[in-house]
UniProtKB/Swiss-Prot annotation:
It is an enzyme of class 5 (isomerase). This is Glucose-6-phosphate isomerase. It holds the Pfam family PGI. It is found in: Cytoplasm. PROSITE patterns: P_GLUCOSE_ISOMERASE_2, P_GLUCOSE_ISOMERASE_3. It catalyses: alpha-D-glucose 6-phosphate = beta-D-fructose 6-phosphate. Belongs to the GPI family. One of its GO terms (molecular function) is monosaccharide binding. It comes from Citrifermentans bemidjiense (strain ATCC BAA-1014 / DSM 16622 / JCM 12645 / Bem). The active site is at 322 (proton donor), 351, 455. GO terms for biological process: gluconeogenesis; glucose 6-phosphate metabolic process; glycolytic process. Pathway: Carbohydrate biosynthesis; gluconeogenesis; Carbohydrate degradation; glycolysis; D-glyceraldehyde 3-phosphate and glycerone phosphate from D-glucose: step 2/4. Catalyzes the reversible isomerization of glucose-6-phosphate to fructose-6-phosphate. The gene is pgi. Its EC number is 5.3.1.9.
Length: 530
């Protein structure tokens, strides 16, 4: 296609909204003539399902739950007045709490103001707050923010080392809907120990974001934590960033959460349109459907040309892959749906995997994200007539053209600048696009049975570890190979898992397991040191 033809196609397909200061360009997705019209009946059904969801229909039948993350930025849409009041009062409580922390009215037990903020959570309880912190944070942050987002001991040690002596002035927010998420529980216990070793009272530094009556809620109440904020069962983790999960850390950091919500609300209003060309989320969903043949046949490569959007690909990985990656459709038919998402940032990626994108296997489509405003304040010229930002823009446009020359399709999303409002709009845009696409391919976007299966399997490993430790302690003078241990436990089918558990136990001194190494690693002998 000639450049003039591409320009005409660009004008024909471009969505631009002056209020949102956002554009969605699908001109480099090779929709055939009449594709939008052909898909309209299916989209109308998707719009109808989305409207029912917003009105309070049980959109997650597996868990018999409503799905209400859109109400978080428009409480008046909630199907019950009590829900609207809870949303409104929670936002007011978040802002009041953050103001009291910033003003020193809520302080550490020794009276010092809080200077640092440690967020403990995993999945959506960490990815959303991390994305907001990284995209909108800066030198004027009111609290320095840190994260425990895994159950990796060394990772937590690294964070605590970074906090250092400021631990005594660190506010801790523990986020878990059920209160029983093991990674989050482990992080909380590690933090408790760090505070105790420093001679500090953890409860005097702690805040919970959790479900009413959860294990974490009971702990916070019993120990008189500084505060508890709600997580409702009608908000999923991956769509919780505009709830207390994301708003409390952001407000404490000093981000304008009202503008964040306003941006999301404005985008929600635009993406309710049933006129597809006037609905940016629908255009995204159609792009995904065409690029992947509605079967996930291609990956989505996310290339934001902005360092502050580096974590957006990780945030979207969960939002898209956990929502769309399903083995069964809503009728119980096996479909193996999903779209794999990966990415980093431009122009860094031009020196990494863009080589394969242009010249290698064609199993992807690209989403470019362009931010027009380079920085706050003027830029120097790195050469006559050109700034660093000019180069970034040039590299974006050049990569887009170079890929399309080789038949690599792409979508480009453009925002004028990064702000709480534009980040809110991007979040809302993708939440809606995921919901619409899920309707197009007939999957439930609001459950995650595979995640639960992984948790159950992990629990089985820990149970087997307990059995191994019990046998080692009962027979302290006996050496076991992995195979011998599995047979002794009458679990021969678990020999590989048994071997891996023994290797890990011996590598760490916490459980008192020693190893005698042999030429063949699977013949290594393990015993209790006790």
């Amino acid at each position: 296609m000639q450049k003039q033809q591409l320009w005409e196609r660009y004008k024909n397909l471009l969505y631009h909204d002056a209020e949102l200061e956002l554009s969605v360009d699908t001109s480099r997705i090779d929709f055939p003539e009449g594709f939008l019209e052909k898909m309209d009946p299916r989209l109308q059904q998707a719009y109808q399902e989305m409207e029912a969801l917003e009105q309070g229909a049980v959109a997650n039948p597996d868990e018999h739950r409503m799905v209400g993350h859109y109400w978080l930025r428009a409480p008046e849409l909630a199907p019950e007045a009590t829900l609207a009041e809870e949303i409104t009062s929670t936002l007011a409580a978040i802002e009041a709490f953050a103001s009291s922390v910033h003003g020193g009215n809520i302080a550490a037990p020794d009276g010092h103001r809080f200077t640092d903020l440690l967020i403990i959570g995993i999945g959506g309880s960490a990815l959303g707050p991390q994305f907001l912190a990284d995209s909108l944070g800066g030198p004027k942050d009111l609290l320095r923010i840190w994260f425990f987002d895994n159950t990796d001991p060394d990772g937590m040690d690294k964070v605590l080392s970074g906090i250092g002596a400021a631990l005594k002035q660190t506010l801790v927010v523990v986020i878990s809907k059920s209160g029983g998420t093991k990674e989050t529980r482990n992080g909380m216990l590690e933090a408790c120990q760090a505070f105790e070793r420093a001679g500090l009272h953890f409860a005097g530094h702690a805040v919970a974001v959790t479900g009413s009556g959860s294990e974490l809620d009971r702990t916070a109440s019993r120990e008189n934590w500084l505060g508890v904020f709600p997580m409702w069962d009608w908000v999923g983790g991956r769509t919780s960033v505009t709830s207390a999960v994301g708003l409390l850390p952001a407000a404490l950091q000093g981000i304008d959460v009202d503008r964040l919500l306003a941006g999301a609300r404005a985008c929600d209003q635009k993406t309710r349109s049933r006129v597809t060309r006037e609905n940016p989320a629908a255009l995204l969903a159609l792009s995904w459907f065409h690029a992947t043949q509605g079967k996930g046949t291609r990956d989505m490569v996310l290339l934001p040309y902005k360092d502050r959007l580096l974590l957006f690909s990780r945030y979207l990985q969960q939002l898209i892959m956990e929502s769309l990656g399903k083995g069964l459709d809503r009728d119980g038919k096996e479909v193996l749906q999903g779209i794999a998402v990966y990415g980093n940032k431009g122009s860094t990626d031009q020196h990494a995997y863009v080589q394969q994108l242009r010249e290698g296997v064609h199993n992807f489509f690209v989403t470019f994200i362009e931010v027009l405003k380079d920085r706050q304040g003027p830029s120097m010229e790195v050469e006559p007539g050109a700034t660093s930002g000019d180069y970034l823009s040039g590299f974006f446009q050049g990569t887009r053209s170079a890929l399309y020359e080789k038949g690599r399709e792409s979508v480009t999303i453009t925002v004028r600048e990064l702000s709480p409002a534009s980040i809110g709009a991007l979040i809302a845009l993708y939440e809606r696009a995921v919901g619409l696409y899920a309707s197009l391919v007939n999957v439930n976007a609001y459950h995650q049975p595979g995640v639960e299966a992984g948790k159950e399997a992990a629990g089985a490993v820990l149970k087997l570890q307990g059995e191994i430790m019990e046998l080692l302690r009962r027979q302290p003078n006996r050496d076991f190979t992995g195979e011998e241990m599995a047979l002794a436990l009458a679990r021969p089918e678990e020999v590989e898992t048994t071997f891996m558990i023994l290797r890990h136990l011996a590598a760490n001194g916490d459980h008192g397991v020693s190893v005698t190494e042999k030429d063949k690693i699977w013949e290594n002998k393990y015993r209790s040191k006790d």
